[in-house]
Swiss-Prot record:
Pfam families: Mannosyl_trans3. Glycans are attached at N199, N338, N408, N556. It is a single-pass type II membrane protein. It comes from Candida albicans (strain SC5314 / ATCC MYA-2876). This is Putative alpha-1,3-mannosyltransferase MNN14. Keywords: Glycoprotein, Glycosyltransferase, Golgi apparatus, Membrane, Signal-anchor, Transferase, Transmembrane, Transmembrane helix, Virulence. Residues 35-685 are lumenal. The keyword RNA-binding does not apply.
Amino acid sequence: MGLLSIPYQSKSKLWIAIFLVVWSLISMHFIWQSQANSGLILKNELSSTSSIPHEFEMLIDTNYPKFKPTSGHSGSQTYSNLFKNQDRNAAIFTILKNFDLEQRCQLYFKNVKNDKLIVDPDHDFKFDRFDYLNWDEYRDESIKRLKGDNDEFVATSSDLDTIKKNFDKAKSRIASDLQLLHDYFSHIKIYNQCYIDRNTSFIKKQHELIDGLNWKTSFKRSSFLSGKQIVTEQQMYPWLSQKSPEYNCLATGQTTKFAANKNSFLNTLKNNLNGKGIVMTIADAHIDYCIRLIHLLRYLKNTLPIQIIYTSNDLSAESKSQLHQASVSDFDGLPQQNITLVNVTPAIKPQYLHKFNEFGNKILAILFNTFEEMIFIDADAILIENPEKFFQLTKYKNSGALFFRDRNTSEYRPDHDIEMFLKLMNSQYDEIIFGLLQITEKTMSIPLFDRKISHVMESGLVLLNRKVHFSQPLIMANMNFFEPIRERVYGDKEMFWLSLSIIGDENYQFNSHPAAAIGQLTTYQERVKTFENPPSSFKSQEICANHPAHISDEDNHTLLWFNSGFQFCNQLEKVNYEDEFSHKERYSQFDTIDKFKTFWQSSLVIESAIIPPENTNSNGGDGYEPSVSWKHMEPYCAGYTWCAYSSIGNGDQANDRGLVINYSPEEIEHFKKLGEIWMRGYNYL
């Protein structure tokens, strides 16, 4: 019987029933889609299926093996949300085969809980090394604190219960804080990959890897993915004002800014990078060093433009005028310098400017200069060669990032420092889904991880290709914000290379040699003064100095640069001359305090250099030879003097022997002339 033959009243009821069924189906569809949009239901997107064989997991683990030192970390909580109630193999296969980068980004950020997306730069993390002690150490130290000066104090069972509760609470908070930091850094890195770096070459390789694999899943083309960017730059970088710094050319007096569309500030900055140049950051306190460096650059016939980064309250009008005069006033007919002052204050929201005090200014200098290739120089650094030559160093040309090592001293980090740094590294999922590479043995071979050495990098001079490593200062900034990270490094030094490893960018190089001592070799007579029965000679040689210096690993001879100015002691305002003169362990050739004072204030004389051994200490030797590669001569130059040794112990092992370099008369004369230029007086009003 056809529909037309049904009585009118019955037909009416039937149409109503049909309408209700259709309405229910439509409603269910929209409810499902709404849930999918919030990341709650991904069943049809990343469906569980028994048709994905175990061989696929083997294929993934072969091509993306978990790196053992970081494999024990849980990874981002977002991945747990994403794969919840899903078969991991089916989900990953679906993503690799069907999702482009934009869809992967949306999938990730839809699974981030809103309250876990951002950690405010002012987030009050508690960091106390006491909380990282093991139970026995924590208990004993807690009892000691309770005891105080009361020798008769005995801890009760109630005291011990309280101590145990505090211990457990501290460990729980540490685990929670580290997971929060890990997840936040994951969000930052993935955002940068999605919307700034946009490297998609890894996806093409994945398609080639699974080409021909057509395992069936119930995947439906990403209907919940809108094509609209879910997370904005303003959300991810709340400390950026989205406004341009002010670039003031001293030669013309012209101030310029760049225009950026809303939420594309960083892309605009990146796209405007061009050329090579020198970058510095100073405040009024550094103006003397900076003027002397400008004089030195003029003598070296520098032609690279210079950008000096500062914040509004740090550099006075008088200092700006002095910089201008130092760059253009007649100076032995030497070339003028092209200097631009960069006021970065407008680019940072006022409430976050304090996060970039002191060492943090260097991060702003790396981020806001406009050079594609930059050489960052501390105001008190001394260049021996024309800056252009640094860009020709092989390791820089091969990687676009060249760093220099610090003194190889025997100072070490606790295990929990190492564990925290490793916690920030990329996971296997980061590499599979976003092409963010896991670290390799290259990172683990760096002395911080390999030997737990505290000081790896000396950051007075840094070479960086900004376009190749654009995200680096963004990660550095976030490292600098948070106390559990900031308190584990000294200033900015280790952040330069750690930030790159955290991104998964191991395309950076270190000059092979650790920092050297430069000056004059200590005489035999000076060294034997402290021995009751001195040896007839020493295997090792010694230089005591206040200036970390850097020798090229291309010829194991050329002095490239050193830090701490050209004055023999760069801490004169802190020196107690009578006290330092009274110590006779070194510098005993000066028989009056006036001679001692004159030497302290004079230009450094460079005749030789010692690169100490790679090993920091040795138990071998006959008691006369040094057991450490560097000895801290704390009584001198307000604690800044270190003595370097060419060998330690018996010097029988290769890593117990360093390198002694004796410079030619021509080289010594060049160093002398540089010292004269740097030490020369000036009067810029």
